[in-house]
Regions:
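Conserved NTP phosphate-binding and transfer environment spanning the P-loop NTPase/kinase superfamily
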Residues: 1-151
């Protein structure tokens, strides 16, 4: 999970900083690789994954009503997803008032930077915790996303 620090957290001077939180479960007391394996089993069983921007998108606030509408479209099966530029396996949901930027050099650079942050986190994590390192597949998938953005 990549998120911004908020003033609700007990941290000094880091508000609005982009950070990686390796899990969304604050009660996890076991190695992260166990969550990774569980998620892989879910996806292998046919479960779909959706990432929803619930705070803001490209600097524009996303209201709770819009978030709920997006969730309802997914649940109802009416969401019409489109390919997300050159990134294989990534799709997006068009939403009025929230246009997808053109995949020009600047936008690709932004996405590459954000994906590189994630990749750097995984590489550092695996170096720091070699006994419970995440599988190479997690890293190679991010490397593939970065390659897709080079074209």
């Amino acid at each position: 999970l990549m998120t911004k620090r908020s003033n609700a957290e007990n941290v000094l001077g880091l508000h609005d900083e982009l950070v990686i939180e390796p899990y969304a479960n604050p009660f996890r007391v076991y190695p992260l690789v166990e969550d990774y394996r569980k998620f892989c089993r879910l996806f292998e069983s046919g479960v779909s994954c959706y990432i929803i921007n619930t705070g803001s998108y490209m600097g524009k606030t996303v209201s709770k009503e819009i978030s709920l509408d997006v969730i309802e479209q997914v649940v109802d099966g009416t969401a019409d997803f489109k390919p997300f530029g050159p990134i294989v396996g990534f799709d997006y949901l068009e939403y009025e008032g929230y246009p997808l930027p053109n995949f020009d050099k600047a936008y690709k650079k932004l996405i590459r930077e954000r994906m590189q942050i994630r990749l750097n986190f995984l590489l550092a994590f695996n170096q720091k915790y070699p006994q419970t390192a995440l599988p190479v597949g997690a890293i190679s998938r991010l490397e593939k996303v970065l390659q897709d953005l080079e074209s």
